[in-house]
Amino acid sequence: MTLYQIKPLFQSLLRATMFWLYKHHVTANHITLAALALSLLTGLLLVLVAQPILFLLLPIVLFIRMALNALDGMLARECNQQTRLGAILNETGDVISDIALYLPFLFLPESNALLVILMLFCTILTEFCGLLAQTINGIRSYAGPFGKSDRALIFGLWGLAVSIYPQWMQWNNLLWSIASILLLWTAINRCRSVLFMSAER
């Protein structure tokens, strides 16, 4: 089970916004770049001013980013804006945005730098395995349990928690460790999906 499974419901809530954007000549690539810029600026702020209270921004920015990601996909598919450049921007933008938004956790008190770096590596590995499925079988794997939407929810909630209760940062390393395990599990599941689909064919 992963939050990706409720994506169609989320998209239906954004459809009116999508049509408004299309009417005003906003393209899928514009939205992708806006999400990337928002992530980079937020990450830079959190790194330069590593104060727990500022992590209150994280759930807000992550929610906006997820909405923008949904909108760029809808514009691409439903408004005939799918391009090779768009695919490149989408995939690289997702990875860069994840790094930009989650790297600041490294600068929080009580955070072990190696654990945060390991978690970021596992995040990249997970997305690579999802793309590997598309390379081999033509269908990208979004298998869980810790996909992009799930990460946004958990890390957004943690950002909210430590901004309100800074003492909770003593549990930072436990969360990074659990997240790394879940990410590795997700990577394995995505690779297994490749093998199962290949076997069925």
Predicted regions and their residues:
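Basic, amphipathic juxtamembrane/active-site segments
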Residues: 74-114
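Glycine-rich active-site/cofactor-binding loop and its immediate structural neighborhood
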Residues: 55-87
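Hydrophobic alpha-helical transmembrane segments
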Residues: 1-63, 100-201
